[in-house]
Amino acid sequence: MSVLDRLGPVPVGILWRLDNGELDGIIPKLIVLLAGTNNLNLKSKLDPTLKASTPDEIVEGLLAIIARLRKKIPTAKILTLGVFPRGPKPGGRFRIAAEKINSLLAEWLKGMERVEFADIGKVFLDGDGNFEEGVTRDHLHLCDEGFKRWRKALDPWLKNVR
């Protein structure tokens, strides 16, 4: 398993790692891509020029990652996950931005060979769109319960890989 997501400007960092040896020598059947939320609120003491990206810019970066993955590992299926809900309440700016990103991604990826889009964020929310108790400590980073739900939501794709 290789985790390509790190703090910072995610698409640029992932593209750099893909171009510099990440995933070399392995041929996964399935790649699960989740990226983009960090770009909604970039702040850095090391680089004050960093600014938040728009949903369109984030989608552009994600599409570049998908293109690079398809070229690097042409036989792999790429499951692109929608940006998870973020922020304490529905209707907040991060929730709206995530919904926009997910809508754009779903449209762009529709019909793309070996690429599937899945918006599984609702597994973390109650019927009113609020995070369920114990899923996250800060309305962004998942706790154990959140990771369990994420893993369970991936079961249909993981079972098809075996």
Identify the residue ranges that each predicted region occupies.
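Loop/turn elements at helix/coil->beta-strand transitions in domains of secreted/extracellular proteins
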Residues: 1, 27-31, 73-78, 112-116
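Conserved beta-strand termini and adjacent loop/short-helix elements that scaffold enzyme active sites
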Residues: 4, 81, 118-120
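Sec-exported extracytoplasmic/periplasmic mature domains
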Residues: 19, 36, 67-74, 106, ...
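Conserved SGNH/GDSL esterase-like catalytic core that processes O-acyl groups on lipids
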Residues: 1-67, 87-103
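Extended, compositionally biased low-complexity polar/Lys-Gly-rich tracts
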Residues: 54-78, 113-114, 154
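Catalytic His-Asp segment of secreted/periplasmic serine-dependent ester chemistry enzymes
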Residues: 85-162
